[in-house]
């Protein structure tokens, strides 16, 4: 089956790559908690209108932190289910399960590979 939208594409420009090379080639490189990363977090936070943001090493880590925060916010709530698509990565589901939530699977929409809205509404 040929899909209308590709799952991935390269959207990095030469300028982006030059900046990454400059950062990685720095003699005192610290990838996750450096001055540059802190500056970027502050600029990012201002740009999206929030007080704080935290950058992590991967989407898997980001998902885990998000679910951990949701667990804290959801502490006294009865519902502990998270709706997730059937087309996903194992790390997405692991972040749900590792934080004590129950994944509720929903079929995808084959035209754009997102969760099927009608199926999501049925699960709520």
Feature map (PLM): residue ranges:
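N-terminal "arm"/small-domain region of PLP-dependent enzymes with the aminotransferase-like
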Residues: 1-30
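Short, flexible active-site loop motifs that bind/organize anionic cofactors or intermediates
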Residues: 7-10, 52, 110
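Short, composition-biased local secondary-structure segments
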Residues: 8-13, 68, 114-121
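Phosphate-binding glycine-rich loop
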Residues: 30-31, 35, 39-81, 95, ...
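PLP-dependent aminotransferase-like
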Residues: 72-124
């Amino acid at each position: 089956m040929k899909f209308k939208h590709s799952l991935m594409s390269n959207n990095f420009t030469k300028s982006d790559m030059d900046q990454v090379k400059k950062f990685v080639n720095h003699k005192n490189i610290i990838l996750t908690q450096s001055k540059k990363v802190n500056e970027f977090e502050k600029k990012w936070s201002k740009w999206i209108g929030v007080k704080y943001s935290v950058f992590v090493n991967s989407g898997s880590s980001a998902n885990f932190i998000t679910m951990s925060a949701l667990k804290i916010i959801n502490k006294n709530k009865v519902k502990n289910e998270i709706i997730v698509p059937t087309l996903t990565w194992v790390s997405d589901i692991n972040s749900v399960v590792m934080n004590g939530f129950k994944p509720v699977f929903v079929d995808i929409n084959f035209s754009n590979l997102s969760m099927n809205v009608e199926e999501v509404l049925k699960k709520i």
